[in-house]
């Protein structure tokens, strides 16, 4: 699968959650609500999830290997940095 579009839908300056992103694959399939989070070791992505009745969060969709996760994270963080830069230029 090829990442064909990354859209940063919401940018946040405050808090740990920095952005909400949608990613399109092969111009045919989209995953919404991927979050860009600021952690102790820098930025990372959190896949869309839901809370189970037991209070545990489970991913709705996620990469099944680390290579795919790394490609996805790289594409998202690159687009996030561009969106952040464009947003600061508007102010």
Curated annotation (Swiss-Prot):
The protein's matches in Pfam families, at most eight in alphabetical order, are given as:
SpoVG
Gene for this chain: spoVG
Family matches, as InterPro entries: SpoVG, SpoVG_sf
Superkingdom is Bacteria
**Its biological purpose:** Could be involved in septation.
* Family matches, as SUPFAM superfamilies: SpoVG-like (SSF160537)
Q: Please, one GO biological process term? A: division septum assembly
- Name of the featured protein: Putative septation protein SpoVG
* Entry keyword set: Cell cycle, Cell division, Septation
Q: Which PANTHER family match?
A: SEPTATION PROTEIN SPOVG-RELATED
Q: Fetch the NCBIfam families from UniProt.
A: PRK13259.1
Q: What is the species listed in this Swiss-Prot or TrEMBL entry?
A: Caldanaerobacter subterraneus subsp. tengcongensis (strain DSM 15242 / JCM 11007 / NBRC 100824 / MB4)
């Amino acid at each position: 699968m090829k990442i064909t579009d990354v859209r940063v839908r919401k940018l946040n300056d405050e808090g740990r959650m920095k952005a909400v992103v949608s990613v399109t694959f092969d111009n045919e399939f989209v995953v919404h609500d991927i979050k860009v989070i600021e952690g102790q070791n820098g930025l990372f992505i959190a896949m869309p999830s839901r809370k189970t009745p037991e209070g545990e969060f489970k991913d709705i969709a996620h990469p099944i290997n680390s290579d795919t996760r790394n490609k996805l994270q790289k594409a998202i963080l690159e687009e996030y940095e561009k969106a952040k830069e464009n947003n600061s230029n508007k102010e």
